């Protein structure tokens, strides 16, 4: 599939409004209702919808910009790939005449699946960590049996006649929009339940214990089955844990590799001394090359993050920051002068080459 930005015909720095407008225009153009029997238009419509599901979501867009589609597959478990044709109406017209996914049904006022954000340290992301988190789930109100009505009775919505939809026209197109009064249920309550304020559900605090595997990065979602919201029929959704990894003071992550900048005295760099560098597993020795320069990089293999899928560890890249003294004693100046004199012939030879270049 082409680049998502190319599919929607927008630049990579497009803002959310530009992306939304481009999606709406293309989705209306290629919608199956306007292209009955046209398989090519149907495939194009699917591509457009998938592109918008990524670019229209800030978190997914950031992951896509950084890692491409492969990064989305890892970070979001490919949960954005499927769609139904009602998505376009849900986004722009408040609902459509298509089936809802399992996540939300017309007889429930909330999604079955729930999501929480968990922030962890750089160290916990490297080694993995166990968590015990408190969060809230939605469940049917027992007082009104999930109806939201004081007398537990529901009445037919007078605005949509119980269909749950209101038809709107735009030019030669007709759109079935979710009824804004009954929220698509086709039913309303006369007097609200006091315990749930007419919502039909209450929120309850629960806790869950789970493991975050080593190697996770910001954007990863962990699915915990049967720990989400509860429907009136007793069906339980899943809990999705969105992981956010905090930045470290010294280490910087790039994919599975870790970067660190280490200060090195100029004599250590020139002489190629052995230095000690911090790693996630503790200090390790690193042999510098003779004549090392500022910003030179050295690789310590297998000291990076372990890849969640392949279980292969990345590397630690050490970049040296060569330090030179700002103040010198008389003795140090004398020693450096002697060292400089010993290199005079070499320096003169280099200067002669530069002069010859201009002739």
UniProtKB/Swiss-Prot annotation:
Keyword Aminoacyl-tRNA synthetase appears in the UniProt entry: no
Cofactor(s) named in the record: Zn(2+)
Keywords of the record: Chaperone, Cytoplasm, DNA replication, Metal-binding, Repeat, Stress response, Zinc, Zinc-finger
GO biological process: chaperone cofactor-dependent protein refolding; DNA replication; protein refolding; response to heat
Location(s) in or outside the cell: Cytoplasm
Domain J intervals: 3-68
Sequence positions that bind Zn(2+) 2: 157, 160, 179, 182
One Pfam family named in its UniProt record: DnaJ
Entry superkingdom: Bacteria
GO CC, any one term: cytoplasm
Placement of CXXCXGXG motif repeats on the sequence: 141-148, 157-164, 179-186, 193-200
Protein family membership: Belongs to the DnaJ family.
Swiss-Prot/TrEMBL domain comment: The J domain is necessary and sufficient to stimulate DnaK ATPase activity. Zinc center 1 plays an important role in the autonomous, DnaK-independent chaperone activity of DnaJ. Zinc center 2 is essential for interaction with DnaK and for DnaJ activity.
PANTHER family according to UniProt: CHAPERONE PROTEIN DNAJ, DNAJ HOMOLOG 1, MITOCHONDRIAL-RELATED
Function according to Swiss-Prot or TrEMBL: Participates actively in the response to hyperosmotic and heat shock by preventing the aggregation of stress-denatured proteins and by disaggregating proteins, also in an autonomous, DnaK-independent fashion. Unfolded proteins bind initially to DnaJ; upon interaction with the DnaJ-bound protein, DnaK hydrolyzes its bound ATP, resulting in the formation of a stable complex. GrpE releases ADP from DnaK; ATP binding to DnaK triggers the release of the substrate protein, thus completing the reaction cycle.
Protein name in UniProt: Chaperone protein DnaJ
Native species: Campylobacter hominis (strain ATCC BAA-381 / DSM 21671 / CCUG 45161 / LMG 19568 / NCTC 13146 / CH001A)
Gene that this polypeptide is encoded by: dnaJ
């Amino acid at each position: 599939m082409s680049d998502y930005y190319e599919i929607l015909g927008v630049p990579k720095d497009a803002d959310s409004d530009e992306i939304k407008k481009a999606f709406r225009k293309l989705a209306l153009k290629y919608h199956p209702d306007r292209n009955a029997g046209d398989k090519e238009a149907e495939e194009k419509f699917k591509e457009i919808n998938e592109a918008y599901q990524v670019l229209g979501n800030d978190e997914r867009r950031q992951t896509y910009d950084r890692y491409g589609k492969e990064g989305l597959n890892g970070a979001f478990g490919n949960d954005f790939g499927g769609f139904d044709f009602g998505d376009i109406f849900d986004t722009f017209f408040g609902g459509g005449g298509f089936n809802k996914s399992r996540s939300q049904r017309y007889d429930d006022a909330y999604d079955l699946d729930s999501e929480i954000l968990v922030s962890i340290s750089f160290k916990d992301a490297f080694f993995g960590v166990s968590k015990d988190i408190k969060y809230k789930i939605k469940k049917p109100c027992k007082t009104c049996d999930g109806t939201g009505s004081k007398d537990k009775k529901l009445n037919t919505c007078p605005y949509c006649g119980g269909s749950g939809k209101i038809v709107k026209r735009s030019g030669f197109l007709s759109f079935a929009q979710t009824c804004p009064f009954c929220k698509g249920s086709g039913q309303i309550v006369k007097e609200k339940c006091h315990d749930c304020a007419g919502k039909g559900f209450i929120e309850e605090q629960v806790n869950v214990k789970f493991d975050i595997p080593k190697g996770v990065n910001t954007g990863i979602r962990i699915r915990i089955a049967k720990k989400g919201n509860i429907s009136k029929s007793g069906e339980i959704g899943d809990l999705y844990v969105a992981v956010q990894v905090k930045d470290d003071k010294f280490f910087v992550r790039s994919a599975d590799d870790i970067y660190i900048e280490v200060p090195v005295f100029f004599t250590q760099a020139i002489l190629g001394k052995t230095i000690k560098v911090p790693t996630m597993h503790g200090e390790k020795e690193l042999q510098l090359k003779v004549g090392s320069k500022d910003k030179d990089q050295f690789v310590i293999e297998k000291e990076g993050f372990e890849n969640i899928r392949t279980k292969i560890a990345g590397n630690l890249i050490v970049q040296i920051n060569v330090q030179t003294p700002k103040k010198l004693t008389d003795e140090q100046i004398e020693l450096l002068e002697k060292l400089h004199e010993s290199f005079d012939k070499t320096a003169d030879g280099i200067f002669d080459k530069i002069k010859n270049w201009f002739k």
